[in-house]
Design a protein with these regions (language model features):
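Intrinsically disordered, low-complexity regions
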Residues: 1-6, 34-35, 40, 62-65, ...
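RNase H-like nuclease fold core
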Residues: 1-48, 52, 59-63, 67
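RNase H catalytic domain
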Residues: 9-16, 55-130
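Intrinsically disordered, low-complexity, compositionally biased regions/tails
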Residues: 25, 88, 153-155
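Juxtamembrane helix-loop transition sites at the ends of transmembrane segments
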Residues: 31, 49, 95, 101, ...
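Alpha-helix initiation/capping motif
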Residues: 45, 90, 142-144
Length: 157
């Protein structure tokens, strides 16, 4: 019987761009959680956070070598881009899209499904927990070291 696993991913950003969090929850076919991981980062947009969550999840699932991996996300944009229905136009998403394509290669079979936010509660909770950590770190920076402008890194004076 093939090993079927389910990967739930979610990303969140405050400020769009702003502090961000990404999370992934890997479950077996019985719905039992095998692994979960979250990461705080930023500045990032919501869409970047969603892709970062998928990267995190694929890296987490790869060593377990499932025969079938079903990815579930509430990001319709990401699902449609990965299905080839939408082009990836945003410059900040292109490298993440390419990275996801590379990470998908070793998997035998991958399905990517759009689900409603309520069905992604565990990944959503972890992503928001990571977002809170990113906000805390951002709040602890001195004002002169905080991010400056859209998509820029840090400016130190």
């Amino acid at each position: 019987m093939p090993r079927h696993m389910f990967l739930y991913v979610d990303g969140a950003a405050a400020g769009n761009p702003g502090p961000a969090g990404a999370a992934a929850v890997l479950k077996d076919a019985d719905g039992d959680t095998l692994l979960e991981k979250a990461r705080a980062f930023g500045p990032a947009t919501n869409n970047v956070a969603e892709y970062q969550a998928l990267v995190l999840g694929l890296e987490m699932a790869a060593p377990l070598q499932p025969d079938i991996l079903t990815v579930r996300t509430d990001s319709e944009l990401m699902v449609r881009q990965l299905a080839g229905q939408y082009k990836v136009r945003a410059p900040n998403l292109k490298p993440l899209y390419r990275k996801v394509q590379r990470l998908l290669e070793p998997f035998k079979s991958v399905e990517i499904e759009h689900i409603q936010r309520g069905k992604n509660a565990e990944a959503d909770r972890l992503a928001h927990k990571a977002l809170q950590e990113a906000r805390r770190v951002d709040a602890e920076l001195p004002p002169t070291a905080r991010r400056s402008g859209r998509g820029k890194k840090f400016r130190l004076k």
